[in-house]
Amino acid sequence: MRVFVYCRVAHDDSFSLEAQAAQLRRYAEQAGYTIIGATAEQGSGLTLDRPGLEKVTQAVLAGKVDMVLVNSIDRIGREWGMTQAYIDLLIQHKVKLLCIRDRLLFDKQGVTYF
């Protein structure tokens, strides 16, 4: 499974970004996933207009990704309608979203708790 690792913090906290990235990489390795890309950024969760998330989106649109791996759902966005729209975009392109801390998997079947 080809995964893109996405990390975000709202405020300058490089330790938190590093911790997220390490946790997600470890999870991917243990699951046998192939990490095809990773990005970590500082930015507001109140908008989807973020350079790091745009990198994820471009990989999704190019068909390079099977799953986006995040620490928690709020790393995508803080407002549910906006976050749901992004999840819908992923699913339209047959890409899953796995939130490891929340233990949520979003895919064409809906949402699964694992």
Where are these regions (language model features)?
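Short, structured surface patches at the beginning of a domain
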Residues: 1-114
